[in-house]
């Protein structure tokens, strides 16, 4: 009896592994899924909708009431970019995005301390839109350890990305760093609450 149960459980486990392995094949080579709850998003390669070439990548929410986000991303060493300015650009197409969609990039230092970040939250892709090019520009400080980037979808909808490019740019190209744009005041103010 125990042997029969073991065989049944083993078959079920192998079947589950093979099913999930098939799902992993949808993720493009060199990329991985992440986010607050990536299982709420279908992600993969699309051979019917693309900006150029033969393929694009897409994220689609499975839950119409989702408040989560999913991302397809890569992480690379910052070593070749230390002290330089980089641009992530790419084309995005969207369908019925009720939350927000974007390309994003983050520069991390020691212990994953964020040194630069832009997820296009202040200029997010919403609704239904045809292919449009977007750009993110960040400085890579000398103490950077990794560069992380990708495409994300927050909430309900579907987003495609194609022709992403990461390249060096010169100082004449302004940074889009959301951390830099949210400067803290130099002095305390209204401590008596009278203003």
Model regions and ranges:
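Bacterial Sec-dependent N-terminal signal peptides
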Residues: 1-26
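Extracellular and organelle-lumenal recognition/adhesion modules and their flexible linkers in secreted
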Residues: 19-195
